[in-house]
Amino acid sequence: MRTIKQFISKTNKVYFFMKDEATCRRFYQAAEAEGISFCGTPPTQKETTDIIALLPSGEICYVGWAGRMCYHNCKKGVVRIDYGKFSEGCGNYLIKWKKSNLSNNSPKLQ
């Protein structure tokens, strides 16, 4: 069985992407069922968002500007999970970092 806790890592930054509010609510319910708190608060009591960080302590939290920069721009040491695909049992739930083909060579997640 797939769990959120399986991604707790001491070496990588772990981010879960939510495509919509319903996906985020499902994530919060699953996290709470696994005993994961949102910095001491039950996740289902928090506002939904598009990206959630899983901390090495096993807690989850919102992502600020620095975390968003890391999510979008860091190539190594970052795990990005599409929670919608993960929760549906899809095998391709990891979001890969790819360099854009644009002229400015800015990174692009696909």
Language-model-detected regions and their locations in the chain:
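Structural boundary micro-motifs
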Residues: 1-110
